[in-house]
Amino acid sequence: MMKRKIKLALADDHMLFRQGLIALLSDYDELKVVTEVPNGLELVKSLKNRPVDVAIIDYEMPEMDGLEATRQIRLKYPDTKIISLTMHNSEELILQLLDKGSNGFLLKDFDSEKVVDAIYAVIENGYYFNDHISKDMLHYVMKSKKLKPKFGISALTDKEIQIIRLICEEKTNKEISDILNLSPRTVEGSRAKIIAKINVKNTAGIVLYAIKNNIIY
């Protein structure tokens, strides 16, 4: 049975950027851009007759910016996942977008793997953050209940929990290997297993999982 395609909408006021992103996503058979518009106003209008699974929205646009578009989409189309695009890695901006209902963030220097990861992450887990966001910010996001990610149930070993705690302390693989008397390769393999077990994409996902499950406080 053929899988249902993930339907996408793209809102960005730079036509060349839209075209480039559409070309990039066209390499993935399971993804389909059904709407591309230059501003938030047209995006919100389009969703009435052409609903999508994920809306990818630039923050800075004329007529209606990404912040207001996010607010309206979350109000009118609560099942639509939203990925915000921005040039600025500003925690203040991230909080504003979270308040309006965004599910994740991409800086506009992303590569193809990052945007595809983000699309699948918001569909599967309800969120996506890159590794540039700070641990303190992730902790605030979780404790303020601005985001409610869905995590798969998993059975972590004591060693994996130790590694998660050290990752949350921003230790490198080398530092973790020294602390736990393991080889760096073993730590790297354990990190990959942890990511697969808890169904996240990156270190930010590990930290969110740890906060959600009281592995760190």
Name each model feature, range by range.
Residues 39, 65-68:
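Acidic catalytic/metal-coordinating carboxylates
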Residues 45-46, 67-79:
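Short amphipathic alpha-helix used as the core "switch/output" element in two-component signaling
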Residues 51-56:
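Active-site beta3 strand of CheY-like receiver
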Residues 58, 86:
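Active-site residues of response regulator receiver
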Residues 61:
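Receiver (REC) domain active-site loop signature in two-component systems and cognate sites
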Residues 138-166:
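Regulatory hinge/linker segments at domain boundaries
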Residues 192-217:
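Basic, Lys/Arg-enriched C-terminal extension of HTH/homeodomain DNA-binding domains
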